[in-house]
Regions:
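Membrane-interfacial helix termini and adjacent extracytoplasmic/periplasmic loops
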Residues: 10, 61-62, 139-180, 214, ...
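C-terminal transmembrane helix and the adjacent membrane-cytosol boundary/short C-terminal tail
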Residues: 2-4, 8, 19, 192-207, ...
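Short membrane-interfacial helix/loop motifs at transmembrane-helix boundaries
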Residues: 33-81, 252-253, 303
């Protein structure tokens, strides 16, 4: 009976396969390809005092049709040290934040995967619970904790461990701490999903052969959880590069990230072509780890 039902379902879906594919294709076109094309078009135009504030790429003359394309915005980005520093600062902070998330999240995911079954759901809820509250409220909460009159400084002053408040706000440390706190669940959940699928018989076999716990972890558990590590790192690193809210609220003038520069170019300077070029270069940088991850997944599927 189940086999007959499966055959009927396949016969029903076969002529409708095009419609099934059309739904995600339409979604991808409307919310990725179309915005991508608009941003690319603006990045190849020139700034102008107009609404919108850029020149048209296509100029309709009396008897001619002229296409105006300029790569000056991209050359300007590469020649200005401010934008190069912003890209480098974003990549550096995103990398450190991702590494910190991995160092904190892996032990958490490992402990969750090894916990009794009735505790795993509770631990999962505790990991996801902060994400159910407003992202902005959680960032503002860190402002109250890290400020000169915040919880940490007041506690240290009360204990007599410091004589004056430690400056933690408006620093790269505060930005990294905020990113780690905000994106830690995106590291823990893929790792947990990967670690729960590990074959315990491999660990038992290693133990029977006399392998110590640390050697079993390094030679069996860690290599088999590589997929979860890469997936979690991508989920943290990619949004962290373009993060705007956390650097704006917790960072200072020395915190130069591409998200803040993009905001200033779009809304303060109203230089949409340069801002669009910034976004396109950032997208190009982010496509590199995505392509590497896709290549790794393809190789794993073949093996």
């Amino acid at each position: 009976m189940p086999a007959l039902t499966s055959q009927r379902l396949r016969r029903w879906l076969k002529p409708r396969r095009g419609w099934v594919i059309a739904v995600p294709l339409l979604w991808l076109t409307l919310f990725f390809l179309l915005p991508f094309g608009i941003v690319l078009k603006i990045s190849l135009s020139e700034a102008a005092i107009a609404i919108p504030p850029y020149s048209a790429m296509v100029d309709f003359g009396a008897e001619t049709l002229r296409l105006v394309v300029t790569f000056g915005n991209y050359l300007f980005l590469m020649s200005d040290s401010l934008y190069v520093s912003a890209y480098w600062g974003s990549l550096k902070i995103a990398f450190v934040s991702t590494l910190a998330c991995l160092l904190i999240g892996y032990p958490m995911a490992y402990a969750m995967a090894r916990a009794p079954a009735h505790w795993q759901l509770v631990l999962l809820l505790l990991v996801m619970l902060p994400s159910w509250t407003s992202f902005l409220i959680r960032v503002y909460a860190w402002m109250g904790i890290l400020s000169n009159n915040g919880l940490i400084n007041n506690t240290l002053l009360w204990l007599g461990l410091i004589d004056s408040p430690i400056r933690m706000m408006n620093t790269n440390f505060a930005v990294i701490l905020g990113i780690v706190y905000a994106y830690l669940p995106f590291m823990v959940l893929p790792l947990y999903a990967n670690l729960t699928r590990l074959d315990n018989s491999l660990l038992e076999a290693a133990s029977d052969l006399g392998s110590r716990s640390i050697n079993t972890f390094l030679r069996v558990t860690l290599p088999l959880s590589k997929g979860g590590i890469i997936a979690g790192s991508m989920l943290v690193f990619i949004p962290a590069v373009g993060e705007y809210v956390i650097p704006e609220l917790l960072g200072g003038p020395d915190t130069l990230m591409i998200g803040k520069v993009l905001w200033e170019e779009f809304f303060n300077n109203r230089d949409w072509p340069v801002a669009s070029a910034l976004a396109m270069v950032m997208l190009g940088l982010l496509l590199i780890p995505i392509a590497l991850f896709h290549r790794y997944q393809s190789r794993e599927l073949k093996e």
